[in-house]
């Protein structure tokens, strides 16, 4: 899973600066910390929005410093994410 996290991090860091803050794994979930989602959705490219769709986000927690933690399943949904980037010639 570490290589999967590295790939996710590389994709998001490359495309979401300065919105991306961190990525980590907890058991069966991946945590992606980004700027407040209402701001990110207004400024990030449509293809990055699709990443979050593919991650099948199930919950968001707004933090005191105006960031949000997005948790997503790590299993089959990860394969869908990689397929999207490969098929998109990214």
Regions found by a protein language model. Give the residues of each.
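Short, non-transmembrane amphipathic alpha-helical segments
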Residues: 12, 43-63
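Helical scaffold of the NTase/Pol beta-like nucleotidyltransferase catalytic core
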Residues: 7-9
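Short edge beta-strands and adjacent turn/loop segments
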Residues: 14-32
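Solvent-exposed, non-transmembrane amphipathic alpha-helical segments
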Residues: 28, 32, 52-54, 71, ...
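Short hydrophobic/aromatic beta-strand micro-patches
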Residues: 33-37
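Short beta-turn/strand-loop junction motif enriched in small, turn-promoting residues
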Residues: 18, 39, 56-57
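N-terminal presequence-like segments and adjacent domain-start helices
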Residues: 1-3
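Polar/charged, Gly/Pro-rich intrinsically disordered segments
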Residues: 38-46, 63-90
């Amino acid at each position: 899973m570490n290589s999967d996290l590295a790939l996710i991090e590389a994709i998001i860091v490359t495309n979401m600066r300065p919105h991306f803050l961190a990525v980590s794994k907890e058991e069966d979930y991946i945590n992606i910390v980004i700027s407040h989602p209402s701001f990110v959705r207004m400024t990030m490219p449509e293809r990055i929005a699709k990443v979050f769709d593919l991650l099948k986000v199930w919950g968001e927690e707004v933090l005191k410093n105006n960031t949000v933690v997005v948790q997503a399943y790590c299993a089959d949904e990860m394969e869908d994410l990689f397929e999207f980037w490969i098929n998109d010639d990214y």
